[in-house]
Amino acid sequence: MTTASQPPLIMGIESSCDETGVAFVRGCELLADEVASSVDEHARFGGVVPEVASRAHLEAMTPTVRRAAERAGVRLSDVDAIAVTVGPGLAGALLVGLSAAKAYALALDKPLYGVNHLVGHVAVDQLEHGPLPKPVVALLVSGGHTSLLLVRDLATDVQLLGETVDDAAGEAYDKVARLLNLPYPGGPPIDRAARDGDGTAIHFPRGKWGDGTYDFSFSGLKTAVARWVEDAERQGRPVSVPDVAAAFQEAVADVLTRKAVDACREHGVRHLVISGGVAANSRLRALAEERCAAAGIEVRVPRPRLCTDNGAMIAALGAEVVAAGLPPSPLDMAVDTSLPVSSVLVN
Amino acid sequence: MLLLAFDTATPAVTTALCESGPDGVRVRAARTTVDARRHGELLTPQIRTVVADAGVDLEDVTHIAVGIGPGPYTGLRVGLATAHALAEALGVPCVGVATLDALAWASGRTTPFIAATDARRKEVFWARYTDAATRVGDIAVNRPADVDTAGLPVIGHGAHLYADVFGQDPEAAEPLYPTAAALGEFAVRALRDGTPLPEPRPLYLRRPDAQIPGAPKKVRQPTAAELGRSR
């Protein structure tokens, strides 16, 4: 299926949370990347409602495939292989994408690769900045995940260094936004509010700071912000939303970048990839640039559109496992809501 | 017409390949596996097996018919997502059949009855039929005790689970599940006779469970003075 002239055409399907993503990729070239999001349907609930997400995936799946194929200028019969998210994620949401992917694989008689969502977040950087150096450390920060990975090889060797023990960083953003009467999802409005604030005005706690692990904790930070706001209100002190937002954001970015740089140092790695929805955060990016520059580490952050959930990340990882010559996944594979990062490919 | 039929809206994962000919509908191959928790694992391999059993290629299929429920949502969506993608990739039309209508057709009954499947949460999805081919009114979801049976026999897994409520022998509930063979026959006949079939979209009959959150919970304990005020 691989010709000397061009790498195989991979269709990637993603449905682990609230975005239905479909993309077409050849090697490191992104041909089309279509996303249908149900985020607006979740906004009034203040978080993703699994059943709402699953229903939206079913409605959006085939139209999104059609749109992506049109945009890429390919026919489904041109596809050489299909990659799909098997996990981690929401069971009902994953199952819609996996069922569709199996049906496409069967009907088109093409191999199917069930891949890991988190590793996809790292692989997607190749579509923007070209092949990843080996090894890299990856910091994945989103509404569902906060993980540090050591990636020696995208297709075959990914190791979990640490992850959040409670809330994901993005979840903390959503909860703090709600405390401050800012809209859902909380990342962009907190980032905007923080621009006019002073990140040193309040010192919020850094969970698991200097505990000798690469794990994170954001639940205590969220509670600390809630306490501070309640105390201020009770005592009749004005609550400066920009200052609270900036100080909260400082605490998140501080602990994330510190542990990421420590991980690079310990493993002698000179490249850090930051991905996931929270990678779009301006303070996280600035502080990572600053600290990595000081430590002689190069930072790679995909553009925001590629950092959030999409089909491109899955197609990019699919291209990588196909190029590595790994065997395809069986048609009876199941979704795995807590698939470990070390399982890049399910077979 | 070579129609591929399947249903995943009950614990039965069921697939059939049906062909219409001059002397009616012929079921070329069919398979059913009952496993309420593995719809996603079972369906696509089952389709591959049924197509192979019939000695045809998937490209020979001219129509797809899928059970649209109602039924437990996660399993139900496996069938629909599969049907949508197969139809798209093969470039063939896809129609829906209410799962209860397939169950009713599978019963072959010629006198009035009620078909009921398990809706979980101690409820059933149900509808009334004058015979195997004819539903009267809409499909509903209720607690078994709230189903107005009007003394009619009740069939299906719902009747089996709540035989005591319906006041009948659990064994009288057969058939418990729809078969894709029945679903396919039902669809082929409707397509041939020009009887409209539903779009291949899910019948949920319930809204998603979700609560709009109130104000954030307070993290501080109220002081004694505050407690005194609220009394």
From Swiss-Prot, chain A:
One of its GO terms (cellular component) is cytoplasm. GO terms for molecular function: iron ion binding; N(6)-L-threonylcarbamoyladenine synthase activity. Its EC number is 2.3.1.234. Gene3D superfamilies: 3.30.420.40. Substrate binds at residues 140-144, 174, 187, 191, 281. It catalyses: L-threonylcarbamoyladenylate + adenosine(37) in tRNA = N(6)-L-threonylcarbamoyladenosine(37) in tRNA + AMP + H(+). Fe cation binds at residues 117, 121, 309. Its main location: cytoplasm. Belongs to the KAE1 / TsaD family. This is tRNA N6-adenosine threonylcarbamoyltransferase. It comes from Thermobifida fusca (strain YX).
